[in-house]
């Protein structure tokens, strides 16, 4: 083992985290109740310290008489401005050679996650991946990389001067758009290289995907180490930091797998680095990241040197302090919070599968997908991938509607599916809000889609302005009609679809083709439905002449400088819906 030298950014006194023996003394009840770094940052934030160094903004000093002060305080608050400081060394701690509260916080994190060492980063897991690869993969060495890895891995490998082989990806199935690394082929490639006398020195795995695919790391790490014990492994678990803290999710995590191999006496890789985007699944500020390490002193020394090379010399102390707080919350409350997330994700799947008002949505997995143990993968049960193709609108438009009209954000779309991440910040009220939004969107858009795809309309389809029906009940739809609706939508018109209220009998002429038979509408008069509790009520434009119901449309594509927030449906009559037109040709 090579000990750190005096020129190393993290020498023995300033090592980023403790050895396992020292961890044990800090990881019990006493350690679980402490947040040393957060406490230290809070202490300096509460003092009236005037800086002659940097950060004029600290404590809001540079904006006290500024016209932008109100906006600053509205965005950040006085506490955030006070906590964003540039102190280092003994005044707070050294980021690259920690000896005080940062060192202690990193020791507690290493104990909590089960690592030999943990580094805090305030520049995200892209930086953590670069640091880890710089430490593990020497120039000229051979690297076997999971093709599904984050871009930061690919860019880092390209800059390191290593010989890279990419293991291929595979698709979940024809019905599900998720992709992931082909782990059986990766392992076979690795074993073949060992047999040929040209083993890979480093393996990179993307073990928890954005789309909710988790790798069987106990099996993968054991097979890699059995074939070549001198291999180093980087495991990117960016989306699974919190999984450590729930018994259902913990078994597949990298650090738990290493603990299991140690307990059972199985072969271990030479070094294992694990990167966690704490802000993705824990209560940490954005760009807060953990880099965990299992290995000897040389691995820790090389990691500390790489951190010095790649991390900013102006770390964010609020971000670092949030990593300390997030660790404590995960240790003391994580299991309870994750249990709620798992239950809510199950509820969402059950509602989508059993509520006829949500029949336009179809949850993809976990049942029936990724169930082949030979794939060495499984579903992340906190992710719900939902097919929305039956709505007749694109996934991109669906995301925009959720955001603009309901204040709900979904980041991921894949084909006709969108991904809901039921993380620990989603509670029962948030899920109910989502379900109500989904029901309203189904009433609105599925009606419009059906009206546009059937041969004969049983609705009024009206563009406003000018309020003149494009089609009336009983009128035949043709490609020209669909094209006209698409053009009006693109120009910013609001498109309404409304059923005829009351009881009526009418015969409508058709411009071309045979006459349309008489249609009789025996539906009862329309009734008014309640507006969603979370949506403000706004007035609709003057209704078109034929229907008497008042509706407020949900508009796609129209200029909307005042839509903050907009209302999707306000006091809409039963049997009526207000919807943007569906692009021509889409079902």
Kindly label every feature range from the protein language model.
Residues 1-3, 8, 535-587:
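Long, low-complexity, intrinsically disordered segments
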Residues 66-83, 245-270, 366-371:
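Charged, glycine/proline-rich intrinsically disordered loops and linkers
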Residues 5-13, 17, 510-542, 548:
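Long, compositionally biased low-complexity repeat segments characteristic
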Residues 125-353:
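Conserved PLP-enzyme active-site core in the AAT-like
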Residues 312, 346-504:
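Conserved C-terminal alpha-helix-loop-beta "cap" of PLP-dependent enzymes
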Residues 32, 36, 96, 100, ...:
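Conserved active-site and cofactor/substrate-binding residues in soluble primary-metabolism enzymes
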Residues 80-127:
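Conserved N-terminal alpha-helix of the aminotransferase class I/II PLP-enzyme fold
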Residues 2-99, 231, 464-466, 472, ...:
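N-terminal "arm"/small-domain region of PLP-dependent enzymes with the aminotransferase-like
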């Amino acid at each position: 083992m090579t000990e750190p030298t005096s020129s190393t950014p993290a020498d023995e006194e300033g090592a980023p985290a403790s050895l396992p023996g020292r961890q044990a003394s800090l990881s019990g009840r006493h350690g679980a109740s402490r947040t040393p770094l957060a406490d230290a940052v809070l202490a300096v934030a509460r003092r009236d310290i005037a800086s002659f160094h940097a950060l004029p903004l600290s404590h809001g000093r540079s904006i006290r008489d500024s016209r932008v002060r109100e906006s600053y305080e509205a965005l950040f608050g006085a506490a955030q401005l006070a906590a964003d400081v540039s102190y280092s060394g003994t005044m707070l701690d050294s980021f690259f050679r920690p000896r005080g509260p940062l060192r202690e916080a990193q020791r507690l994190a290493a104990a909590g996650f089960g690592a030999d060492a943990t580094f805090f980063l305030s520049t995200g897991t892209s930086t953590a991946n670069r640091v880890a690869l710089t430490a593990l993969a020497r120039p000229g060495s051979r690297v076997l990389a999971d093709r599904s890895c984050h871009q930061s891995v690919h860019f880092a490998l390209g800059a390191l001067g290593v010989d890279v082989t990419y293991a291929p990806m595979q698709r979940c199935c024809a019905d599900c758009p998720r992709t992931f690394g082909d782990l059986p082929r990766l392992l076979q490639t690795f074993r073949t290289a060992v047999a040929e006398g040209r083993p890979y020195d480093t393996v990179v795995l993307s073990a928890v995907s954005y789309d909710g695919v988790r790798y069987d790391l106990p099996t993968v790490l054991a097979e890699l180490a059995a074939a070549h014990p001198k291999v180093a492994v980087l495991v990117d678990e960016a989306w699974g930091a919190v999984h450590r803290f729930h018994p259902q999710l913990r078994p597949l995590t990298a650090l738990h797998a290493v603990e299991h191999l140690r307990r059972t006496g199985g072969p271990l890789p030479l070094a294992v680095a694990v990167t966690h985007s704490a802000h993705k699944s824990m209560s940490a500020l954005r760009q807060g990241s953990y880099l965990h390490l299992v290995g000897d002193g040389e691995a820790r020394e090389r990691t500390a040197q790489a951190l010095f090379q790649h991390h900013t010399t102006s770390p964010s102390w609020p971000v670092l302090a949030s990593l300390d707080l997030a660790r404590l919350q995960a240790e003391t409350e994580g299991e309870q919070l994750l249990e709620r997330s798992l239950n809510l994700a199950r509820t969402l799947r059950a509602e989508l599968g059993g509520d006829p008002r949500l029949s336009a949505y179809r949850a993809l997995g976990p049942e029936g997908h990724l169930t082949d143990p030979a794939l060495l993968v499984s579903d992340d049960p906190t992710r719900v991938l939902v097919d929305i193709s039956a709505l007749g609108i694109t996934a991109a438009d669906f995301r925009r509607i959720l955001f603009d009209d309901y204040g709900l954000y979904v980041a991921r779309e894949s084909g006709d599916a969108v991904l809901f991440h039921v993380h620990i910040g989603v509670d029962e009220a948030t899920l109910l809000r989502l379900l109500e939004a989904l029901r309203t969107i189904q009433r609105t858009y599925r009606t419009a889609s059906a009206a546009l795809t059937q041969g004969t309309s049983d609705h009024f389809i009206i563009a406003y302005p000018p309020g003149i029906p494009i089609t009336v009940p009983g009128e035949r739809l043709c490609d020209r009609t669909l094209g006209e609706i698409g053009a009006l939508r693109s120009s910013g018109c609001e498109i309404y679809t409304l059923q005829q209220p009351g009881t009526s009998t009418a015969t409508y002429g058709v411009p071309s083709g045979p006459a349309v038979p008489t249609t009789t509408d025996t539906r009862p008069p329309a009734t008014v439905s309640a507006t969603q509790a979370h949506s403000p009520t706004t007035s609709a434009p003057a209704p078109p002449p034929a229907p008497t119901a008042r509706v407020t449309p949900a508009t796609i594509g129209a200029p909307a400088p005042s839509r903050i927030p907009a209302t999707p449906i306000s006091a809409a009559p039963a049997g009526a819906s207000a919807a943007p037109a569906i692009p021509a040709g889409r079902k």
